[in-house]
Amino acid sequence: MTSVTSKDGTSIAYQRSGSGPAVILVGGGLDDGSENAALVPELAQHHTVYNYARRGRGESGDTAPYALEREIEDIAALIGEAGGSAHLFGASSGGALALEAAAAGLAVDRIAVYEVPYLDEAMVGHWSVYVGELTAALADGRRGDALALFMRLAGSSDDDIAAARTSPQWAGGEALAHTLAYDAACLGD
């Protein structure tokens, strides 16, 4: 992986493939940069693709305190690497981040988002409870509990969560669980 330095000094890791107009892939929750990997070969036929690991994930650094503005600066640094403008594709909370980056005035040529989990009014109360419980779990160092909260919010049953806790993938999810707070910040109140 190659890296670019964001405005606050954080190293942001990315892989670059193909040639043509730049497309930056913005991954969602618990993604270390691998979520969009299957898109890269197709897009790279006609684009220069920047598939990156958002801060705190994969090989990218993480500088406290977290702020949504830092993630927008990360995308700005990638746009700089891409020559000054780019298309953005964001999945899930990465879609919310891509929209925030465009709204902040970054040089975004086009934007596409997939399954951004914005809430309707009926879910706002559930979201507030989730964010409060997530914040408490992470403050107490209970990454596994934070991951279970996320899975429950996404519709997993208690049995599914119990089974997931014994899977080989659980440790990887726990390693990224602190970034669930970052995704919550991207989605706002």
What are the roles of these predicted feature ranges?
Residues 3-61:
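Conserved HGGG/HGGXW glycine-rich cap/lid loop of the alpha/beta-hydrolase fold
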Residues 138-139:
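Hydrophobic/aromatic side-chain positions at a characteristic register within alpha-helices
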Residues 85-122:
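Conserved hydrolase catalytic core segment
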